[in-house]
């Protein structure tokens, strides 16, 4: 199983449902709560003029309508997960996180 697919499964477990989308097209009708994620960067660790390790960075957005929803806390338990920001649009809460995967 690839690293992205492994992350996908971990996000499904954190959310408690299958509503996890990797770069969904605009035609997908979202149902809340859900998670949308996409690859945003690749970190390269270098030594002796060569790359010895690389990590993909994914932006993970947890969307929900219940202000007490706890999936964000579950995602933050993943290794190398960091919280970035929170905002609300049309009574839908958005928590933006970054998760690194090797």
For each predicted feature, which ranges?
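Acidic-leaning, charged glycine-interspersed low-complexity segments
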Residues: 74-102
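Short coil/turn motifs at beta-sheet boundaries
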Residues: 30, 51-55, 90-92
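General N-terminal targeting signals
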Residues: 37-39, 52-54, 77-79
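Glycine-rich loops and low-complexity Gly/Arg-rich segments
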Residues: 45-48, 59-64, 83-88
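Oligomerization/assembly interface segments of phage tail-like spikes and tubes
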Residues: 54-66, 93-102
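Small/polar-rich, solvent-exposed N-terminal microdomains that initiate assembly or binding
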Residues: 1-44, 50
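Short, conserved charged micro-motifs
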Residues: 67-74
């Amino acid at each position: 199983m690839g690293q992205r697919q492994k992350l996908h499964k971990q996000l499904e477990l954190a959310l408690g449902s299958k509503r996890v989308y990797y770069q969904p097209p605009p035609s997908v009708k979202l149902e809340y709560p859900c998670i949308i994620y996409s690859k945003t960067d690749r970190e390269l660790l270098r030594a002796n003029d060569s790359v010895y390790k690389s990590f993909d960075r994914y932006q993970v957005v947890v969307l929900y309508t219940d202000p007490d929803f706890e999936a964000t806390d579950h995602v933050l338990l993943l290794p190398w997960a960091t919280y970035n920001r929170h905002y609300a649009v049309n009574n839908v809460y958005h928590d933006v996180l970054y998760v690194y995967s090797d």
